[in-house]
């Protein structure tokens, strides 16, 4: 590596400072978006959990053969809904989901099962497309304008149709979820079939109620909401975790830039000192030569 002049080093320091200003601004933007996203997430989680509890309770109470979405079959064909971000600059946020998905696909294929993917998020599409995976549907650029129940109803309709018509025997959902402001985890959740957790205390309580028009009709409506809202929650969870991951990544980048500035400033001072020393020696030598 060629030795840099003080001017080159100074230019390099200025470039790092410019980058630091950008990462600092991106951290501030991500922090603001994170606060807004957390408010939406805090409103989404309780409804999602209560909806699941209702379906779980009713599924214990009814004949599972009354609705195709409740039927449990041997798993020969499996669909995986993969949720990533559209953008990068968020550390290992997207790579965690992709790595987990690859592991799940390998596990299922080694068990002799056919695996199909539904991709949500540009990073998932970019990675899995044209690599030999069976892709049923792919969606990009959905977080800005399409992160709503209208979009999840569209995807949910595909999932429901495939399960009802036995095109798939199980559906898994893989996405990142926010744990704390500084941490997130990649979750693998089974959407279908719904396998209720038997609670005979609850079963006794439910049997006391008269459900109108009938438990079957109520359950059918809830199942539609369940698919759509679980997908919606996955998008909200992923979006919130993405903002947190990007905020952390930009904070780390800002700090790393600060450390780099310190190191290059020391190098600059040494180079300038060497240049001054060299000039002084040249002046002294010239003076001695004149004498």
Swiss-Prot record:
Pfam families: ATP-synt. It is a peripheral membrane protein. Signal peptide: none annotated. GO terms for molecular function: ATP binding; proton-transporting ATP synthase activity, rotational mechanism. Keywords: ATP synthesis, Cell inner membrane, Cell membrane, CF(1), Hydrogen ion transport, Ion transport, Membrane, Transport. GO terms for biological process: proton motive force-driven plasma membrane ATP synthesis. It is found in: Cell inner membrane. InterPro entries: ATP_synth_F1_ATPase_gsu, ATP_synth_F1_gsu. GO terms for cellular component: plasma membrane; proton-transporting ATP synthase complex. NCBIfam families: ATPsyn_F1gamma, PRK14110.1. F-type ATPases have 2 components, CF(1) - the catalytic core - and CF(0) - the membrane proton channel. CF(1) has five subunits: alpha(3), beta(3), gamma(1), delta(1), epsilon(1). CF(0) has three main subunits: a, b and c. Belongs to the ATPase gamma chain family. Produces ATP from ADP in the presence of a proton gradient across the membrane. The gamma chain is believed to be important in regulating ATPase activity and the flow of protons through the CF(0) complex. This is ATP synthase gamma chain. It comes from Persephonella marina (strain DSM 14350 / EX-H1).
């Amino acid at each position: 590596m060629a030795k840099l002049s003080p001017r080159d080093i100074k230019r390099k320091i200025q470039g790092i400072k410019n980058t630091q200003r950008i990462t600092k601004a991106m951290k501030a933007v991500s922090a603001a978006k994170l606060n807004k996203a957390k408010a939406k997430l805090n409103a989404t989680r309780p409804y999602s959990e209560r909806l699941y509890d209702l379906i779980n309770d009713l599924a214990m109470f009814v004949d599972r053969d009354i609705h195709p979405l409740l039927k449990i079959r041997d798993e020969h064909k499996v669909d995986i809904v993969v949720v990533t971000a559209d953008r990068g600059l968020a550390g290992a946020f997207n790579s965690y989901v992709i790595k987990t998905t690859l592991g799940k696909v390998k596990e299922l294929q080694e068990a002799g099962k056919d695996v199909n993917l539904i991709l949500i998020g540009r990073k998932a599409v970019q990675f899995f497309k044209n690599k030999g995976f069976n892709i049923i549907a792919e969606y990009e650029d959905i977080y800005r304008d399409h992160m709503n129940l209208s979009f999840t109803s569209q995807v949910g309709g595909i999932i429901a149709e495939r399960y009802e018509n036995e095109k798939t025997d199980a559906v898994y959902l893989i996405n990142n979820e926010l744990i704390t402001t500084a941490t997130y985890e990649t979750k693998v959740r089974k959407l279908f079939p719904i396998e209720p957790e038997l609670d005979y205390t609850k079963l006794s309580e439910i049997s006391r109620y008269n459900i109108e028009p009938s438990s079957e009709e109520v359950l059918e409506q809830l199942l539609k909401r369940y698919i759509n809202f679980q997908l919606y929650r996955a998008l909200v969870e992923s979006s919130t975790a993405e903002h947190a991951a990007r905020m952390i990544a930009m904070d780390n980048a800002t700090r790393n830039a600060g450390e780099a500035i310190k190191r290059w400033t020391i190098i600059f001072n040494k180079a300038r000192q060497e240049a001054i020393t060299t000039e002084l020696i040249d002046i002294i030598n010239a003076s001695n030569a004149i004498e």
